[in-house]
Amino acid sequence: MEPKTSAAGTVQHLDHFVLPVMQPERAEKFYVEVLGGKVLRKMNDASVNRTFIKIGQNHIGLFSQTKAVLPKPETLDSFPRYGFVVSGDDFQKIRLKLHVADGLARKIEKRGIATGCGADEGIAFADSEGNLVELFRGEGDAPARLHHLHFDTLDLEESIRFYTDILRLTLLERDKGLAVIGVPSRQSIVLHEVAELSPVTTTTYRGRHFAFHVRDEDFHAIVERLHRAGIDERDDHGEREGRRPEQLGTYFKEPSGFRLQITNEDSATFAAHAR
C-alpha cells in the first residue's frame, strides 16, 4: 500500500482515450486521411490489433474487437461522444473531407452548456466505425487537441459527486439534466442525465478507457480517495504491454461504467517512446 500523501490529488488534463473499432485498417485510414493523424505505433497479436495515432497534442488508441460489436449510429446525439478542437484552417479541410467521405455528419447548432464548447463553430459526425465525434473550430493556428467528452448518466448527482470528490474537478455549469465538469487545460466532461444508458455505454469494449495525466504525488492521493470510497482500482484492468518501470497507472470505473485511467505519462512522453 502506498504511504498517505498530503498532495491535493488533482489531474492535469484529459490526455488520451482508446476507441473500439471493427476494422482496424479502415479506422486507421479514417483518422489519418480525414482527421490528419499520424500513426505512432502498432501492437498486434492474435487477440487484438492496437493502433496508436497522434492527433495534435494528444493521442488516441484504436483497438479491434473480437466479441463486442459497435452498432451503426442512428443519431449523432447518442453517447459517448468525443470532442476535438482544431485550427480554423484544419477545420475547413476536415469538414470538406467529411462530406467527401459521405458519412453521418451535420453542423452543431446548439450553443453553450449543451455542447460544453461555448459558441465555437462545430460539426458532429460518426467515424468509419460508428464512434461519435465532435470537431470545433479553435482560435488561431494552435495544434489539434482533445477538448471534451459527452457521457450519459442515470444519476446526475452521483456523477457530479464522483468527478468533484474523487478527481477534484470543478462543476462549471448545471442546467436541466446537464452538467459541465471542468478539466484543467480548458477541457470538459459534459454529463447528460438519461432514463436509459446508451448501448455503447453499457457494452464492454476491450481496451476502451479515458486517461487523465497526473503528477506522481497526485496519483497516490487519488488512489487513496478511491480506496476510501470503496471504488476498485487496479492496473490489470488495462493493457500492460509497453509499460515502462517508472510509469504509474491504474484503472477504475465512474458511475456510468466508463473505465477511467490516471497515469503520470502524457501524450508527449508516449510519443517519444512509441516509435
Regions found by a protein language model. Give the residues of each.
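N-terminal beta-strand motif that seeds the catalytic metal site of vicinal oxygen chelate
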Residues: 1-25, 81-82, 136-160, 187, ...
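Vicinal oxygen chelate
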Residues: 2-9, 13-22, 51-54, 71-143, 224-275, ...
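Short beta-strand/turn micro-motifs at beta-sheet edges
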Residues: 3-6, 68-72, 136-138, 194-200
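Core segments of cupin and vicinal oxygen chelate
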Residues: 9, 19-66, 151-195
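Acidic (E/D-rich), amphipathic helical modules within compact regulatory domains
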Residues: 42-52, 56, 85, 108, ...
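Residues that act as N-cap/strand-start positions at coil-to-secondary-structure junctions
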Residues: 47, 78, 117-119, 175, ...
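Structured core of small recognition/catalytic domains
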Residues: 145-150, 157-262, 266-273
